[in-house]
Each structure stands twice: as C-alpha cells, then as structure tokens.
C-alpha cells in the first residue's frame, strides 16, 4: 500500500470529514476505477455544454453557469450525500461558464480556446499517469513546496492587483501584451509556471481519492 501524505488537499469537497460523514448514508465502497469513470463522464458533460456555448457564441451563459455552479458547489460541500446527483448538473453549468469565457478570450486572442482544451486534457492525463506510475509522489515535502509556491503566486497576484489599481498597469512579468502582439517572454514563463503549480495541486486530490479507496471508504 502506498504511503500517503498527512497534508490534505485544499479542495473543500475533499476535506478530512468527507468519508466520515458519507459512511453514515451508504455502505457501498468507492473504487479508483469507479472514481475515474465518473470523473470522465463529468468531464464529457462539461465539454459538451462548453462546446454548445462556444459554437452558439452566447456569452450570457457565463453568469448562468457561474451562479448556478457556485450554488451547486455549496450544496455539494454541505450535503455530500447528494454528490451523485449534483455533480452532473455542476459539470454542465461549469461547461456553460467556461464556454462563454472561452468566447471572450478567443475574440481577443484567436486560437487560445482550442489550445486550452488540448492543454487541459494533456495535463490531466499526464499527471494521472505520472501519479499512478509513482513518478510523482504526494510526500510531505512535496506538499510543503506546493503550498509555498501556491502562496507565493497568490501574493504576486494580490500585489499586481494593487499596482494596477494605483498605476493602471500590470507588473512586467504579468503583462499579457496587446491583442495581436506577443507577450513578453518573462510573462509567458511566469504563466507556464502558474499552470504547472496549479496542475500539481491535482496530485493531492489523486492521493486523497486513492487513500479513500484503500481504506474502503463509502461510495
């Protein structure tokens, strides 16, 4: 059995009380295969609604998706036994929001939406493979480093927000550049770093889910 990190994921739906509370409502046991299958179905639903929104070019779905998704997320966090029913609807609403946001960004930076889709699938698949093959392990040091990097990024964005309020411009390494013009290489490098750190947070979720399967947590 693999040794798991004692640090927990920052996902509020995967807190330390998740399995404890769920055990009161069901005797069915979760499996890694079942979790992956349901995650795949949810991702498929998300992609379908996102594709619909993107092809119809209806940005009004952004507010519907964000508000509806936020409400369902809160319901799922506090009523975890409802997760099998709320998850598909949450995925559909998030797809509406992401599709609308993709329309906005694709109008400013043509082709960026398609790149984001391929990167999302690629990163998720690569990280899942790396975790299962133990190329990446959710150790204590890994968690500490990830928390430090994530916190540093958050502080950088807060500073950038304050600077933009006062000066009307962004920090140089966060400059996107004008539409149609290339962004500074340091900005591109910082963006890649942020994507990598954000993606590595998925490893903590993988570790938490696998631990639940190993201890026979409820479905």
Region locations from a protein language model:
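A hydrophobic alpha-helical transmembrane-helix feature that marks the membrane cores
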Residues: 1-219
């Amino acid at each position: 059995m693999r040794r798991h990190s004692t640090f927990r994921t920052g996902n509020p739906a995967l807190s330390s009380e998740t399995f404890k509370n769920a055990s009161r409502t069901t005797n069915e046991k979760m499996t890694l295969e079942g979790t992956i299958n349901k995650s795949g179905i949810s991702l498929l639903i998300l992609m379908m609604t996102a594709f619909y929104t993107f092809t119809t070019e209806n940005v009004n779905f952004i507010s519907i998706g964000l508000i509806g998704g936020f409400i369902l997320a809160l319901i799922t966090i506090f009523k975890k036994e409802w997760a099998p029913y709320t998850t598909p609807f949450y995925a559909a609403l998030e797809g509406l929001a992401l599709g609308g946001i993709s329309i906005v960004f694709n109008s400013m930076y043509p082709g960026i939406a398609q790149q984001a889709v391929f990167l999302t699938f690629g990163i998720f698949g690569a990280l899942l493979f790396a975790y299962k093959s133990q190329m990446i392990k959710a150790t204590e040091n890994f968690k500490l480093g990830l928390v430090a990097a994530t916190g540093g990024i958050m502080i950088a964005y807060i500073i950038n927000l304050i600077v933009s309020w006062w000066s009307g411009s962004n920090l140089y390494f966060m400059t996107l550049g004008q539409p149609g013009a290339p962004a500074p290489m340091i900005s591109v490098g910082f963006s890649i770093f942020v994507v990598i750190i954000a993606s590595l947070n998925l490893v903590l979720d993988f570790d938490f889910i696998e631990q639940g399967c190993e201890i026979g947590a409820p479905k």
